[in-house]
A protein has these predicted regions:
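Append "and, occasionally, other polyanion-binding protein interfaces
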Residues: 1-21, 76-111, 153, 160, ...
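Charged low-complexity intrinsically disordered patches
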Residues: 51-52, 58-78, 128-180
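Intrinsic disorder/low-complexity detector
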Residues: 19-21, 29-85, 98, 110-135
Length: 180
């Protein structure tokens, strides 16, 4: 497992699918980004709806561009909101069923892109979300700092060498009767 950038274009279809299909969809995203061959055939797979297939086609070209870039910026960062999906989150996801995994990924997406904290719920998805929350908050803080302009720019005009500021002549003022 290696970290990858989670774009809001992945979250959009996930939040529209029911939890079980969202979990399956996200597993396919992870498999695809790990270099595995992913094929979708709605006609022969009863689990996959035409809606599921269309959602996959809507992001497949962006997934391919990201995979070919080997994790480096491929222009998607400038077009879409995003955050790093750490191996820690992926590991938590692998422990969950498709249904719980879908709930988990939806919680993360809602928290990161919509600022919606999940309400207390039964099940492992909520527990795992709470375990991941501290790291998500760190990513959120970096996103907010980046929105403000990120790291401060270096000064383009460095101080000139050999330039000494002139001192005012206090002795001359005292001779003229000005004591202020």
């Amino acid at each position: 497992m290696k970290p990858f950038t989670f774009y809001d274009i992945y979250y959009t279809p996930l939040k529209e699918l029911d939890d079980k299909h969202a979990g399956k969809f996200f597993r396919m995203i992870c498999d695809f980004l790990d270099g595995k061959q992913v094929t979708i055939d709605a006609e022969n797979d009863a689990e996959i709806s035409s809606e599921f297939e269309l959602y996959w086609e809507s992001i497949s070209s962006d997934l391919e561009a990201y995979r070919k870039s080997a994790g480096k910026s491929c222009g998607l960062d400038k077009r879409y909101k995003h955050f790093p999906f750490l191996p820690f989150y992926q590991k938590a996801f692998t422990y969950l069923s498709d249904s719980e995994g879908g709930t988990f990924v939806k919680m993360i997406g809602a928290y990161m892109f919509e600022n919606k904290a999940p309400t207390k719920a039964d099940g492992d998805a909520f527990k795992y979300f709470n375990i991941c929350k501290r790291k998500l908050d760190e990513s959120k803080q970096r996103m907010q700092n980046g929105a403000k302009g990120g790291r401060p720019k270096k000064n383009k005009n460095p101080p000139q060498e050999g330039h000494v500021p002139e001192k005012c002549d206090t002795f001359a003022r005292k001779e003229n009767g000005n004591h202020s």
